[in-house]
């Protein structure tokens, strides 16, 4: 055994002893308060338990492996529909309490006292439909997390799912702790580990994890204005060459460095035209009232959402298909104490109940959507009567675009319409009082200002980014100015009422 392996084993053993001691200390009272480490646990549990369960795919008749099951907050709920639940925890008194609570009611639960990091834990490959873990990985060191995820992927059947929920950045519960060995990581650590995990079956087929969704737990945002409770749902899929639109956004158009350089141009918190200036102008048109609920489609890194929540005391749900965008948004939310939650979601497949939102807001995002009429029908359904939609978006002039502009549209994967047609699509979806304004003159002024500021501050830009980044911005803005000045590229503002 080499020196590195010996050191890793020693650190691993110390980590397990520390974590076991911590949870033995906090498991003396086998209550929901001690498990959640919060004096308001009963109220939080009432809010968050249905929210968490609603994120899961159907588990009716399925095999569910619950890691870190505790005293069974979720065990009984899972057992109501699952074919078989394997509930596992590494504290003996805790799993016995779980069995005492749920064992007589549900005969489809197997209770196990085991440490998820132990090589002695044997779960058959391709035997589990869903792995469910609520507050577990934060009690493992980085190496243990990586090894466990690798094992979980093997345990899962193809098409199976992993749900994890972790406290990130800092603690949430108010329980006093003599020591706290919890690893409060940035969410991007978990995202990276899951995205980089691969496994192979006996036939040599390669499998990876595809993100279904990632979001803040809304119950904590509402009750504590705390965005650090993050969950992820992943699906085990066969590796393919075509990684889909989400991978395109995160690896091509909205890479982390690309997002940061966009923010440098648009202003802190913003990745859409005009930054704070246009956000304030447009949001002020909505006549927002305290307590209203806003859906931001294509929320980016959250600047507009923070502005709405902090200025008007509304609750904002920001969704974006880009994992990178949402990761930045969540990081920027920490410490702001505002009622904003974020979720990685595809607006074309996401479903909300009818009459959920007072306002739906979207800035320079719907240009990516090919079937706008279907999306606008959903917007109409999701809005409350009297609710408003506000959209700014790239548009084009009527008629056939030039070869150069057509190539740009194709390369970006955009679906662009003229301003009048765009407004008509909103009318056809059922909206009234549709305002469809050509804001291209404003677009040109903003582009000129942003380009001028970038060129003026070239030295500062190059201190943080590369020459290639600088050239991409300058060339991109110059090209937009050229297309818009020629009358080909347009910018529209649309406001409509249900």
UniProtKB/Swiss-Prot annotation:
Origin superkingdom: Eukaryota
Modulation of this protein's activity: Inhibited by phosphatidic acid.
Pathway entry: Phospholipid metabolism; phosphatidylcholine biosynthesis; phosphocholine from phosphoethanolamine: step 1/1
One Pfam family recorded for the sequence: Methyltransf_31
UniProt keyword terms in alphabetical order: Methyltransferase, Transferase
Reactions the enzyme catalyzes: phosphoethanolamine + S-adenosyl-L-methionine = N-methylethanolamine phosphate + S-adenosyl-L-homocysteine + H(+); N-methylethanolamine phosphate + S-adenosyl-L-methionine = N,N-dimethylethanolamine phosphate + S-adenosyl-L-homocysteine + H(+); N,N-dimethylethanolamine phosphate + S-adenosyl-L-methionine = phosphocholine + S-adenosyl-L-homocysteine + H(+)
Name of this chain's protein: Phosphoethanolamine N-methyltransferase 1
Source species of the chain: Triticum aestivum (Wheat)
